[in-house]
Amino acid sequence: MPELIVPVGLVCGIDEAGRGPLAGPVVAAAVILDPERPIVGLNDSKKLSEKKRDALAEIIRERALAWAVAEATVEEIDRLNILQATMLAMQRAVAALQVKAESALVDGNRCPKLDIPCEAVVKGDGKIASIAAASILAKTVRDAGMLVLHAQYPHYGFDRHMGYPTAAHFAALEAHGASPVHRRSFGPVARQLSLL
C-alpha cells in the first residue's frame, strides 16, 4: 500500500469507527507501524470480512511499534455533537500511544487538534497502511463493545447491526423506545423520544 504523503518522523495513522450509528460510542485508534515488520493485507476495515479484520487486528497489536484505542461516550456525542466527539476520541487515542508520534495522518477531511503535524487524507483507510491499521483496530474494538451492549439490551439487535440505522433497528426503537446507549441527539432517536 503506497504512502502517498511524505510523513515526518514516526507517523501515526488515525481512524474512527461508529460515526453513523444511532447507539454506542464512537471509537478511534492510532497506530504507528514498524517498517521492519510489514503487515500484508491491510485495507479499509469496511472492505474486509469480520474474520480477516479480527486476524489482522491481532497482527497489528503484535507488530506495530505502538497502538492505542479510545472512545467518546454516547453522553459526549450528545453534548458535543458527533464530529467534535470523534475528534476527542482521536485526540485520546494519540495521547494514549506508548511511543510519541512525530506526525499524524488521519482518514477523512479533518484533523483533530494535536501537538504534532497532522494531515487529513480522504479515503486514507484504503490508501495508507497506518490509517488502514487504525481503521481495523477501531472497528474490531467497537464491534466487541457493541456485543457487550447487546448482552445488556438484547431487544435492539446490536449484535447484528452494531447500532447502525437498519429497518430492524428502527423497528426495535419503535417497539421498545430508546435505551440508555442510544444517541439522543441523532434524528431518528430524537423523533422516537418525541413520540413517547
From Swiss-Prot:
GO terms for biological process: DNA replication, removal of RNA primer; mismatch repair. It comes from Dechloromonas aromatica (strain RCB). SUPFAM superfamilies: Ribonuclease H-like. It comes from the Bacteria. InterPro entries: RNase_HII (IPR022898), RNase_HII/HIII (IPR001352), RNase_HII/HIII_dom (IPR024567), RNaseH-like_sf (IPR012337), RNaseH_sf (IPR036397). Keywords: Cytoplasm, Endonuclease, Hydrolase, Manganese, Metal-binding, Nuclease. Its main location: cytoplasm. Belongs to the RNase HII family. One of its GO terms (molecular function) is manganese ion binding. Its cofactor is Mn(2+); Mg(2+). The keyword Transmembrane does not apply. The lineage of its organism: Bacteria, Pseudomonadati, Pseudomonadota, Betaproteobacteria, Rhodocyclales. This is Ribonuclease HII. Manganese or magnesium. Binds 1 divalent metal ion per monomer in the absence of substrate. May bind a second metal ion after substrate binding. It catalyses: Endonucleolytic cleavage to 5'-phosphomonoester. Endonuclease that specifically degrades the RNA of RNA-DNA hybrids. Gene3D superfamilies: Ribonuclease H-like superfamily/Ribonuclease H. Its EC number is 3.1.26.4.
